[in-house]
Amino acid sequence: MKKIKREDKVMRSTIYISTLLILLVMNLSSQSIKVGDKAPDFKLPYATKDTIVFSGVSLSDLIGKRNIVLAFYPADWSGGCTTEMCTFRDNFSELSKLDAEVLGISGDYVFSHHEWAKHLNLQFKLLSDHKHEVAKLYNSYDENSGYNKRTIFIIDKTGRVAYINWRYDVRNPKHFEELQKALADLK
């Protein structure tokens, strides 16, 4: 009888330790970027209303020049994303006065970005992260839907994350106001 109890304890201990290890690994893999962290560098092709640049732009090339607004969004030509990008377009001069450069990032190809930017008359770059590598790096990719999550990051001139909105809501004007305030605080 004692032998069974000992084996039972060993089995429970093994299960307990295995469960803890699994939870630890899951926690480490789901850690996300925090305000104050160095922003992960990347290089992606992009389009504007005027051109397509296959050689791309890297975050490190932009650091030190202006504050960067990384706007991850699900897809070109969709309602919510159109609203979001038009908000950036309509407030472009104010964002420029706040020393900000907007970079929209989705999984769409640069050809779609180019046509959409022309259609909406967007003044900023739309980056093509077709394999979602950058979105995953920034914990802004939804595995279930296969699209980017709608998230906003501000990267300051030193290359640090200064602001994050994990659930940016295009229908909530306060979210854009918070973004503007965060940029104003960096001036």
Residue ranges and their predicted role:
Residues N148-K187:
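Thiol-/selenol-based redox modules, centered on thioredoxin-like
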